[in-house]
């Protein structure tokens, strides 16, 4: 995390080392201990295995082999419940009908399929401020591609998270958000450094108790990076700027001081 103040170099060094460790561990991990909690059921259908899916969905099944979801274990000893049918349900009726869409589960149309395993995400969508997935206006697949890469359609400017695009970063985390949030995309003459870490450094995309799906309330969010300290003589500095007094309640932008929080074309301090 970028930190403006005395501890910047130390924290950046520690954070960089930790990030490298995570990357190395990710690259060396070929299987996961997580199991599919509840594969979907389809009345009258049986599991046929992912090989049957490959007959029609060749490119999807080929890319899926490198995806996180492909490494999930099946409940019990039924290996056929792994792979495609772990999320789409048993496919025998879908296959025998020549690909009839009503005879297979499509998580894009039913986010409850994803929520069978992602229970904590389902809970976040119940929070006061959230993306409208439960309301049916969005689906998990609008931001995530479970068939490729590590499954998050974006990984920040340089973060190796799951993305959409053949196991590579076709869309960064920010670019995924900017598909809808166009005004925040820029480019700006003066860009907020926080964007380099990705939108999720400030926002909780599944849901939050805070307005605008912010991860923290009020000025606490800004102070995670911009250190507030009292110097000799009583002056209050935030970063390198003398703010005279400690931050009031509210946020740095709602108070009318830094309204262009994502970036500005005319002011280096994001005042407007």
Residue ranges and their predicted role:
Residues 2-12, 22-272:
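Short sequence/structural segments immediately N-terminal
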């Amino acid at each position: 995390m970028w930190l403006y103040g005395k501890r910047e170099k130390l924290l950046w060094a520690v954070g960089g080392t930790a990030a490298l460790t995570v990357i190395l561990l990710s690259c060396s991990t070929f299987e996961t201990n997580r199991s599919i909690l509840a594969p979907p059921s389809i009345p009258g259908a049986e599991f046929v295995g992912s090989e049957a899916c490959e007959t029609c969905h060749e490119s999807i099944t080929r890319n899926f082999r490198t995806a996180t979801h492909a490494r999930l274990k099946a409940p019990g000893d039924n290996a056929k419940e792994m792979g495609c049918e772990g999320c789409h349900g048993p496919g025998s009726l879908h296959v025998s009908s020549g690909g009839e869409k009503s005879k297979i589960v499509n998580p894009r149309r039913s986010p409850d399929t994803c929520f069978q395993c992602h229970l904590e995400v389902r809970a976040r969508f119940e929070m006061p401020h959230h993306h409208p997935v439960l309301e049916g206006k969005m689906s998990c697949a609008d931001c995530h591609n479970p068939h490729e890469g590590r499954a998050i359609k974006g990984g920040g400017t340089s973060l190796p998270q799951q993305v959409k695009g053949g196991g590579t970063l076709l869309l960064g985390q920010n670019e995924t958000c900017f598909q809808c949030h166009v005004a925040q995309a820029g480019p700006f003459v003066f860009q907020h450094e926080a964007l380099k870490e990705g939108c999720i450094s400030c926002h909780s995309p599944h849901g939050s108790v805070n307005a605008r799906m912010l991860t923290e309330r009020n000025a606490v969010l800004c102070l995670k990076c911009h250190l507030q300290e009292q110097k000799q003589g009583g002056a209050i500095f935030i970063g390198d700027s003398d703010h005279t007094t400690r931050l009031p309640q509210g946020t740095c932008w709602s108070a009318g001081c830094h309204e262009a929080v994502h970036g500005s074309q005319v002011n280096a301090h994001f005042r407007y």
